[in-house]
Amino acid sequence: MLNNLEQLTTEKVNLETLNIDEKSPLEIVKVINEEDKKVALAVEKELPNIAKAVEKIIEAFKTNGRLIYLGAGTSGRLGILDAAECPPTFGTSKEQVIGLIAGGREALLEAVEGAEDSKEEGIKDLKNIKLTSQDIVVGIAASGRTPYVVGGLNYANNIGATTVALCCNKDAVITRVADIAIVPVVGPEVIAGSTRLKSGTAQKLVLNMLTTASMIGVGKVYKNLMVDVQTTNEKLEDRSKRIVMMATGVGEIEATEILKNSNYQPKVAILMINTGCSFVEATAKLQEAGGFVKKALEYIKEGEEIC
C-alpha cells in the first residue's frame, strides 16, 4: 500500500506549473490562483455524495450521535479546525463534533514521524472516545490510503457506525471501506505532492458543507443567522445582539435587554420578542419545535401553542 505513489493523481507532476520556479512572485500567485479555481468545480461534482453524508449526520445528531473526523497531517488538522469551530458557531458541546489526528495534540504543530502509518493508532483513538454505532466517522486523507484512517474506518464499520471517506484520488482504498465516498479530484498540485494546497482546500470546502448543512438540519440556523452562537467574548456578544436585531427588527437597546433576559440565547430572545412569551415559555416552545425557531413561530402563529 506504500508503493506506487506516482499512480496517485495528487502525486503527479502538474504540467501547468513545470516552470513555476522561473516566474516572478506575481506570476506565481496567478498560477496558484488559476489552479485553485479548479477546486470548487471538483467539489461541485461531489455534491450528491456530500448531501448523502449530511443526511446521515443529521440522523446521528437527532439520536445523540457524534460526528468524528479522522485524519493525519493537513487532513487531520483541517478536521480539528472544523470541529473546534462548531461550539462557538452553533452552540454544540465539545463532544458533538470531534477531530482526531494521527500523533495526537503534538501533531497539530509539527509532524510526528510515522504516526499516520499505524492502523492500530486509528483504532485506538476511536476506542479512546468510546465510538458507538450511533456515530458518524469521516476519514480524511488526500491520498485515500493513509493506514491510520484505513484502520479507523474498518473499526468503525465493525461496530456499526456510519463511515464516510473524503479523499482526492479515484478508487482509493478508503473509498472501498466507507459507506459514502466523497472524492473531489482536483488534479496534480502546483508543487507535486503538496496536498496541503488544492487537496487541502477541497477538503476544507467539503468539511464546511458537512457541518454547516447538518447544523441547519437540526435547527441551529434561523433564516441565515447563527442563532445558537455562544457569547463567549465581546465580539460574539455583539454578534448575538445584531442577530436578534436582524431577526426581529428591534433596536439595539431592546435587543440588549431581551438578550440579557434570555440568558444570552439568541433563539430564545427572538421568540420572546416576536411572540411576547416569557423566557420559560419561549424555552418550552423552542424545545417542542425541536430547536427550530421558524417552526416554533409557526406553531404559535397557527394557535397550536399560545403563550
From Swiss-Prot:
The GO terms describing molecular function are: carbohydrate derivative binding; carbon-oxygen lyase activity; ether hydrolase activity
GO BP annotations of the record are: amino sugar catabolic process; N-acetylmuramic acid catabolic process; peptidoglycan turnover
Where does the record place the catalytic residues?
85, 116
Q: Which domain of life is it from?
A: Bacteria
Name the pathway it acts in. Amino-sugar metabolism; N-acetylmuramate degradation
Annotated family? Belongs to the GCKR-like family. MurNAc-6-P etherase subfamily.
* Protein name, per record: N-acetylmuramic acid 6-phosphate etherase
> What species is given as this protein's source?
Alkaliphilus metalliredigens (strain QYMF)
